Amino acid sequence: MRLNTLSPAAGSNPSKKRVGRGIGSGLGKTGGRGHKGQKSRSGGKVRVGFEGGQMPLKQRLPKFGFTSRKSLVTAEVRLSELAKVEGNVIDLNSLKAANVITKNIVFAKVVLSGEIATAVTVKGLRVTKGAKAAIEAAGGKIEE
């Protein structure tokens, strides 16, 4: 194989469509755009979701719910992620230092997902019932 013998695989480099270049090309006259109408004109596009003046589906459906502002500063921490923290006292700052949660997080909750093998002390974090049982079974404890 040499640089001067390289060529693209068969069919991988099709020639571009040359539109409006005569009837024999197959894309002459209207150039594959059909007859008249907005989509046949240059710049004739409709925005996403536009239904020709009819009230769009997005606006016909009711609004519901909201985004809790508290959820933006709250994180769920899995039991398996507690192993990433060095030391056996786990609090908000140690989770941030270990890059388990981001710096803008104010509240964290430990949930039962994965396993924990080492005995750790969890300070100042919310803990689910299942996670609490798993931490205590591993010889750890929870402090408020």
UniProtKB/Swiss-Prot annotation:
Highest rank taxon of the organism: Bacteria
Chain intervals with Polar residues compositional bias: 1-14
Protein keywords: Ribonucleoprotein, Ribosomal protein, RNA-binding, rRNA-binding
Disordered: annotated span: 1-52
Subunit structure: Part of the 50S ribosomal subunit.
Function: Binds to the 23S rRNA.
NCBIfam families in UniProt: rplO_bact (TIGR01071)
Protein known as: Large ribosomal subunit protein uL15
Source organism: Aliivibrio salmonicida (strain LFI1238)
Name of the encoding gene: rplO
